[in-house]
Amino acid sequence: MEFKVIEGGICAAKGFKANGVYCGIKRPANDTPNAKHKNDICIFVSDVVCNTAAVYTQNKVKGAPILVTKANLEKSGNKAIAVIANSKNANTCNADGVEKAEMMCEMLANELNVPKEQVVVASTGVIGQVLPIEPIKAGIPDLVKGLCYNKNLEAATAIMTTDTVKKEYALEFEINGTKCH
């Protein structure tokens, strides 16, 4: 089988929309009202419920998003329709992490009108800090409103921490004469 690298990231696959915005999870110390900020939260949404698979850390210390995602996939029979992810804060090793991860899933589910068990959550960033939920709550309506089949770069930018390259990749291949992405 031959694979071809293509543009589009998550949006290269038919039926997947994405968006990323800045909501203010961690404001810079020298923040000004007109400052340009890097996106810090994103969503990926499928047109239909998808079968899912997940690989989890074997580490004894697991972040709240991992625990919530695992529980949601168990409840949904490994089905998901959306992912919500943030940067700047790993939501790991803090007292209310699970509650905040569950809230992220529930808020997005309510905005999309889907079961919360079909939403999975991811966080990347600093470990051990409390995740501020209010900026996320305020940002979710804009995320959903701006969902589009070509906003993969906005979403990829939102999950960058100290990375210099966006975390996205898309392939094209053929199965029985049908092109797949």
Show the residue positions of the predicted features.
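Glycine-rich oxoanion-binding loops at beta->alpha junctions
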Residues: 51-74, 160-176
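Structural motif
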Residues: 40-43, 65, 81-85, 117-120, ...
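Glycine-rich, mobile lid/loop segments that gate access to catalytic sites or pores
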Residues: 99-103, 107-181
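Short, well-ordered amphipathic alpha-helical segments that serve as non-catalytic structural scaffolds
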Residues: 61-74, 98-112
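Short glycine-rich or small-residue beta-strand-to-loop segments that form or flank ligand, phosphate
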Residues: 82-94, 120-127
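Active-site pocket-shaping loop/turn-to-helix segments
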Residues: 56, 92-102
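N-terminal amphipathic/basic leader segments beginning at the initiator methionine
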Residues: 1-61
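Interfacial helix-loop-helix linkers and transmembrane-helix boundary segments
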Residues: 75-79
